[in-house]
């Protein structure tokens, strides 16, 4: 069994991700569970009944506490001085933004006890059928973690 998890806010849902998640429903095998965590209410049923919506703040009160604790800390908000601000490395100091991703994964991991738990960024648009055989190649049974490696300094964490 596969569970694909993502998180986003309502603005991102309306701008692009609604179409993207619809493509997941069309191209992933029917037995794949699709879970969307958001801090905003999103009517996913209007897109596809297969998408499961979960309120991120209800599922992860620790995220709310984390954001409150670090709301004024520039190292958690992407403002670490002129040297990094506005550069490609600024993401390293956007802990609050990326915490939504990690807390969504952690929340879902607490309730899933079988199969693969897979993070997929909400900006992914699927254009080709992903068969069960293809997923088995991406996520081999003899491995516990899979991700998209790439040359250079940073790995791709949009699919893990």
How should each PLM-predicted stretch be described?
Residues 21-31:
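Short, acidic, metal-binding catalytic loop of nucleotide-sugar glycosyltransferases
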Residues 9-12, 41-43, 58-61, 124-126, ...:
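Short, solvent-exposed loop/turn segments at secondary-structure junctions
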Residues 34-39:
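Short internal beta-strands
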Residues 31-33, 116:
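Residues at the starts of beta-strands that form the adenosine-phosphate
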Residues 97-148:
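GT-A fold catalytic core of metal-dependent nucleotide-sugar glycosyltransferases
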Residues 1-18:
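N-proximal low-complexity "stem/linker" segments adjacent to membrane-targeting elements
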């Amino acid at each position: 069994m596969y569970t694909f998890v993502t998180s986003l806010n309502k603005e991102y849902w309306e701008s692009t991700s609604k179409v993207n998640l619809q493509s997941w429903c069309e191209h992933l095998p029917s037995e794949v569970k699709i879970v969307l965590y958001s801090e905003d209410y999103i009517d996913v049923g209007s897109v596809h009944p297969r998408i499961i919506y979960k309120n991120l703040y209800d599922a992860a009160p620790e995220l709310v506490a984390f954001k409150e604790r670090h709301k004024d800390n520039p190292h958690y908000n992407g403002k670490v001085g002129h040297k990094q601000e506005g550069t490609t490395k600024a993401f390293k100091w956007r802990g609050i933004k990326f915490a939504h991703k990690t807390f969504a994964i952690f929340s879902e991991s607490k309730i899933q006890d079988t199969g693969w738990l897979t993070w997929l960024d909400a900006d992914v648009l699927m254009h080709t059928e992903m068969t069960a055989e293809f997923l088995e190649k991406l996520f081999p049974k003899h491995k516990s973690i899979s991700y998209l490696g790439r040359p250079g300094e940073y790995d791709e964490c949009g699919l893990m």
